[in-house]
Amino acid sequence: MDYEIKTLDNGSAGTAVLPDEIFGVTPRADIMARVVHWQLAKRRAGTHKVKGMGEVSGTTKKPYRQKGTGSARQGSLRAPQYRTGGAVHGPVVRDHGYDLPKKVRRLGLISALSQKAAEGKLVVLDAATASGRTSELAAKVKALGWKSALIVDATVEENFGRAARNLPKIDALPTIGANVYDILNHDVLAITRAGVEGLKERLA
C-alpha cells in the first residue's frame, strides 16, 4: 500500500510503499488481547506479601486445654480466626510473568500495526528530529492535530526524546521497543521512514 510521507511541519515528502504482510493483514483482536495481557503481567512487581500462620509473631503455646472448658478446641493463637492470626492463602512474592510464543507476539504486533492502518490513524514521517525544546515540538504536534501519539523511529534522537518527554500522551520508541500495548494505548501511530525499515527487519 502507498502512504504519503509527512514532515513534522505538516508538509509532504513523497510517498512510501508499506508491505501488506505487516500493515495490511486482518487484525486479530484475540491475539492482541493475549499479547497485552502478557505485557501487563510481566510489568507487575509481584511484591505483595502477607504473613501466614507460621510467620506472625506470637506464642506457640496451646491457649487452653483440649477438653472441659466448654469452648471450641484451639491449638494456636496464631490461627487465622484470631485477630492477630496469620492469613490463609494470602498473596506471596512471586513473578506474574509467563511465556508467550514468539509467533503469537509477532502476530499481535502485526495486528496492531494493521489496525492503525485500517483506522486511518497511521502516519509515515520523513524523520523525527527536534531542537530539544518542548515548546517547539508541542506547536508542531498541535498543528498536526495529535492529542495522543506514539512516534516510532529506528533509534530515537536524543533531542527529540528530550523534547517529547514533557508532552502528555506523546511518546517516542525505537523500533525494537515497539509493542502492542503502547500502539493501542495511543490514538495516532507515527512511524518514520527508518522506523518502517526497522520494523520490516524485525518482523521479517
UniProtKB/Swiss-Prot annotation:
What cellular component terms from Gene Ontology apply here? ribonucleoprotein complex; ribosome
GO BP annotations of the record are: translation
Q: Where is this region: Disordered?
A: 49-90
Which molecular function term from Gene Ontology is one that the record holds?
A: structural constituent of ribosome
Q: Which Gene3D superfamilies match?
A: 3.40.1370.10
* Xref: InterPro entries: Ribosomal_uL4, Ribosomal_uL4-like, Ribosomal_uL4_dom_sf
Q: Where are the transmembrane segments?
A: none
- Source organism, top-level taxon: Bacteria
Q: What does this protein do?
A: One of the primary rRNA binding proteins, this protein initially binds near the 5'-end of the 23S rRNA. It is important during the early stages of 50S assembly. It makes multiple contacts with different domains of the 23S rRNA in the assembled 50S subunit and ribosome. Forms part of the polypeptide exit tunnel.
Summarize subunit and interaction data from the UniProt record for this chain. Answer: Part of the 50S ribosomal subunit.
Give the family per the record.
Belongs to the universal ribosomal protein uL4 family.
Mind telling me what this protein is named? Large ribosomal subunit protein uL4
Q: Which gene encodes it?
A: rplD
